[in-house]
Amino acid sequence: MSPIPTPPAGWRAAAERSVIRGRRIDRLIPWFLLDSPISRVGYWYGCTVGWVWGSLWSVGRVEQREGLWVFRGMPRWTFPRGGSCVGGCFLTGDGAVTPALLRHEAVHKRQWQRYGFLMPLLYLFAGRDPLRNRFEIEAGLEDGNYVPRGTA
């Protein structure tokens, strides 16, 4: 995925507001659903879904890097944007899997561990715009290749 060449004016302030809004939402979630045995079940379910989907469609190398199972060579229609983290599985195409990108995806893995079954729903509510999606912002917009280096 190519970064947004020139992020729109005011994007940093909007990103900060998105993170703050996300933290407010977190306070509404019952404590026993976050970083708990329940969320771990959701994380492992996500890992299972990621493994099955990756195993079905990956024609590239499958390797473990930085605590993630990386499924390469996925057809473009099987994942959004430049790749997708489902549980502890990073599903991607033929693009470069850099240390920065793995750092970004490792944060998503940690988010899956924290939120479990809630992760897909919360991510959906956060929206498709990475500059306003609190999960992408927390994972690092530069590392995720959403904005050019030096702009975040």
Annotate each predicted stretch with a short phrase.
Residues 69-96:
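Active-site scaffold of zinc-dependent metalloenzymes
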Residues 100-112:
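Active-site recognition of the HExxH zinc-binding catalytic motif
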Residues 41, 99, 131, 135:
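Hydrophobic (often cysteine-bearing) scaffold residues that line and stabilize catalytic clefts
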Residues 141-152:
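Short helix/loop segments within enzyme catalytic domains
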Residues 27-64, 113-124:
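A transmembrane-helix-recognition feature enriched in membrane-embedded lipid enzymes
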Residues 1-47:
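N-terminal low-structure segments adjacent to metalloprotease catalytic domains
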